[in-house]
Amino acid sequence: MKPVLVTHESYQNFVIEQLQKHYSGGILTLVSKDWPIIAKLWVTDISCTTTLLSDTYSLKGPAPRDPASMLRSYLLFLLTNPTIGITKWVDELYRVPLYAILSGFEPGDIPGVGTFYDFFQRLWGLDNANVKPKIMRKRKKKKKKKLKKGEKQVPKSPGIVEKLVNRFFRYGSKKKLLIGDRLFDFFQSQFLDVSAKLGLLGHLNSLGVAGDGTPLETARYPRSKPTCDCSDKGIKQCKHPRLYSQPDCNSGWDSSRERFFNGYHLYMISSSDSKYDLPLYPRLHPASRHDSVSLVASSIEFSQRFTLGTVSKFLLDAAHDAEAIYKLLNHLEIEPFIDLNPRTKKNYSTENDIQISPKGIPICSSGKEMKPNGYDISQNRQKWRCSLTSGTKNICNKPCSTAKYGRTFHTFLKDNVRLFTKTPRSSGKWKLIYKRRTSVERSNKREKIDYHLEAGRHRSTKMWYIRIYCIMMCQHIDAWYCEKKKTLKLSELIFSKTA
């Protein structure tokens, strides 16, 4: 039968009633580290989960578990014991009454392991747990050369980024249904929207975001089984398809651990203006995919799905320093802030005596870098002037111009979108904005280190997406708690009526 909606106020009353019953003057007591967990779930309203999943339940049959309580229990699992599995978590719900109460269950009346996985399937909403079919042709094993310390793998196909961007310019990109769309819609409406209203994402009319990829190891080696009996017949190397347990995964290079791994390449987009480094959009790619290739797909998908504001700037590291990426972001009306990946130490020559440094800064005939002097929007060009002038004063020993305000020079964005950025790399504004790029790295660190993302031991893209999104929900819950903890007095509220 259909689940009955339990409002967040009803959940809060249930928590008060159960804590007063079991933790007031009895054997069970609450310690100081319990209160942050209680407060985090107290401020998190996910009652709409029941409305979202109502269509997945039939009109007849036994009464189901409250979907909001199931999701709340999984979030509590990630907040307290993310390294264990669901089976052990059910044991924890029986062992610790507080966990059952905070989930929304009465102590002793706990859902089983199968009930949790049934809930995950309803939350997922698709028949397929992976993008690719499990039965595929046998993958060829190639001996891969180990890369140097800190070195990252390069794209397999040279020029692939430019080809993808040109294809997007030529044919466009219609919004297609992705396997993670249901989770993102829920995450955006129930978590991103709340954080936005609290002012935790930054200015929504001019939002800054940062993107970066990180390895997600799901297994050390690919696992597969034969679909034929050739081995029994003595045929060792047959070409029949094999059954892969993780068809969406492949092998890639982890530059931080300096080893090859099997799994995904998680590309994360986070808010660079958020003081809590809050994540916005995750995308799982094959492990062999390069950051620049992942960005092309992730940025287009994010621009089609994010509806809470307008992205004005995108902060990326030097791995994304490709001319095609600048053109793509400019086409999406997003200003790129990308660190240069030095390809030469020589200056570029121009039609006059001015040269251009590898960083895109004009250099006068005296060998000094010029300073930015405003951007002309009408002609889409950046103005530069002599760095030794201040007003009408010029302290240069060999001035290269007799102009009253010193030598000036203009660079046009259309000439080289990579070198001549709208905001000059040498300006203080660039440095102030770009120093927030590491916010996405801190966000990834929280997911992988604090919440033990790779401890999932899952075998399907479905479960990895559910784990990732729920960890992102926990990151937002942590931020809400930090904003509201000074005004929360739960101890007085819960035990005020007990003597």
Language model regions located:
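An internal, acidic/charged active-site-proximal segment
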Residues: 292-388, 424
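Basic, amphipathic alpha-helical segments enriched in Lys/Arg and hydrophobic/aromatic residues
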Residues: 430-499
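Polybasic low-complexity intrinsically disordered regions
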Residues: 91, 124-314, 318-331, 339-341
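Dynamic "connector" segments at or just before major functional cores
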Residues: 1-70, 76-79, 107, 119-187, ...
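Short amphipathic alpha-helical "interface-anchor" segments enriched in bulky aromatics
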Residues: 93-94, 353-377, 413-461
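DNA-recognition alpha helix
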Residues: 85-104
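Long, low-complexity, polar/charged, intrinsically disordered or flexibly structured peripheral segments
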Residues: 219-220, 228-230, 234-244, 252, ...
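Short, conserved catalytic/metal-binding motifs centered on acidic residues
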Residues: 73, 89-90, 107-119, 205-216, ...
